[in-house]
Amino acid sequence: HIAWYAIRDLARNRWGILYTAFFLVVTAGLFYMQAQSAKVAVSLMSVCLFLIPLVSSLFGTIYFYNSREFMELVLTQPVSRRTVFLGMYLGLAAALVGGFIVGVGIPSLVMGDWSNDQLVSILMLLTIGSFLTVIFLAISFLIAIIFDDRGKGLAAALGVWLFTALVYDGLVLLGAMTFSDYPLETPMLIA
């Protein structure tokens, strides 16, 4: 029941609607400019790798802080903490993943060409975007639990996003350039 509450709450939330509309407009615009689904998937992947962790981290942290009083009220009932936490997490994850899948999936269905390779690339994009949403949402909930202060929690969420989106990639590229004389195919695939 708590997950359904979170889904209904986010269905009315303007930020959730803007998140879905953003992916609808960007995906439709990319299909309008490029006819091949594989090229659109590559372009969308770069947008998703940058934007989904940011939105999931910040939105998850803000939502957790804003729902803290509601969760305290629900915990006065005979409900376990695990049930409340999982309900809030699964509801928020379902809403964000659903918004992403609708935002990317509808233009892909309508405007995409459906050869096997291009279908696989769009499905991979949807899968990776969904996993990114779920992972960074879990990290944002952990951050909101660790930090009671909203400002510190948001700063930590932004710091985690900054590290994973920019610093980690920079360190991998620096390592690749430093050890360019050595065969790095396998370590680069792992990193």
Residue spans for each PLM region:
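Secretory targeting signals
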Residues: T27-L51, G91-A157
